[in-house]
Amino acid sequence: MPPHSFPKAVILSLCLAGPALATPCSDTGGQYESWKPLMAEEAQAAGVGRRGIEALMATSYSKATIGADRNQKSFRYSLEKFMQVRGADAIISQGRKRKAQNADFYAAIEAQYGVPAGVLLAIHGMETGFGNFMGDTNVVSAIATLSYDCRRSDFFTPHLIAALKLIDMGAISPQTVGAKHGELGHTQFLPGNALTYGVDGNGDGQLDLTDFVDAMASTANFLRQKGWRPGAGYQPGEPNFAVIEEWNAATVYQQAIAIMAARIDG
């Protein structure tokens, strides 16, 4: 009888006992259900609790995530085309309005973290249209699928462990939705970055990246912790441009953020 034919409670008890196994990846969805108990052992050994393990066992293989992972066309565009496709002019226009409407808030963020409003607004606009669309894919299933898939398993498995720990903490739920690669909230944090750099910006005692204040504080904290130098430039060749590279590895994305941020702040 395959592992996924056992009652859920039996699988969970097996996952919470014994040493972790090396968890094999696969390029098709056929072995996903058999993979989950093995991944659960690895997660438990990494410190994931019962709530996180239960969430992992409830996931399903996400064909939508695999499709998106194989079809990231926009990062292959020229800078001009990329900015056109991603709506740079609208982001700049909206960014200026939002900065003016929330001047004290962005000034306080910059005073605390050293990151200017334009950078945060450019990222916010680029990632989710200023929170208008934060995704429609189950986060845990998306990240688990990418951990299971051989293409980038080593990269995504730590993010899966982090997502399960976020569930243990109550920062997300098993039903939380995000982008196709499991990114979370207003600025689309991967779970590992959310766990490491997330900030309870509004002081309610809970990290929630779908909350605007938490998301902006967390984004600024990420950049500062990655080496952002307050007052230094962020255009190509300037000290803080390398920190934008930490946010997204695509050159056109980095260049677009730098251009939009300067125009928002200008």
Regions found by a protein language model. Name each.
Residues S5, A20-L21:
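Post-cleavage N-terminal segment of exported redox proteins
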Residues A9-P19:
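Bacterial N-terminal signal peptides
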Residues Q31-R50, E54:
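Mature N-terminal segment immediately following signal peptide/propeptide cleavage
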